[in-house]
């Protein structure tokens, strides 16, 4: 059996700054690795405090430098919001800097307001 942790980076109240929320996400990942968890997964959401994680690939790249063993995953990258060639280039880069620890999760997205604000039609 394997264990993972899902990092939403949720700002539960405005008493928390963005820096505190992101700092907590970083700390949770480091502690998860120390506790023997196999994977840390990072969300992608935009334009709200439900999740302050607009780029799970950036989070994986950052955490690759702060961890040694734990696998790092995207949960999920919202594919319609990306330009395909750039997305593939970034995935390749992140997999390289993480020494092959990237677990890539992709999805179609579901929050209509995120698509509207990016000027993308939701399928």
Regions found by a protein language model. Give the residues of each.
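N-terminal beta1-alpha1-beta2 module of alpha/beta enzyme domains
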Residues: 1-72
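Flexible, glycine-rich active-site loops centered on histidine and acidic residues
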Residues: 2-18, 81-123
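Structural motif
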Residues: 43, 75, 105-107
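Catalytic metal-binding/acid-base residues of hydrolase active sites
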Residues: 46, 77, 109-111
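Amphipathic repeat-derived elements
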Residues: 64-65, 72-74, 98-103
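Active-site nucleophile and cofactor-binding loops and adjacent substrate-binding regions
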Residues: 74-82
């Amino acid at each position: 059996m394997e264990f993972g942790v899902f990092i939403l980076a949720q700002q539960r109240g405005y008493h928390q700054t963005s820096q505190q929320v992101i700092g907590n996400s970083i700390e949770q990942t480091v502690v998860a690795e120390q506790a023997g968890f196999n994977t840390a997964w990072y969300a992608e959401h935009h334009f709200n405090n439900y999740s302050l994680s607009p780029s799970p690939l950036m989070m994986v790249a950052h955490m690759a430098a702060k961890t040694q063993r734990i696998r790092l995953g995207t949960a999920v990258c919202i594919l319609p919001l990306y330009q395909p060639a750039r997305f593939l280039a970034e995935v390749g880069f992140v997999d390289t800097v993480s020494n092959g620890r990237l677990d890539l999760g992709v999805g179609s997205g579901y929050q209509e307001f995120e698509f509207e604000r990016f000027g993308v039609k939701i399928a």
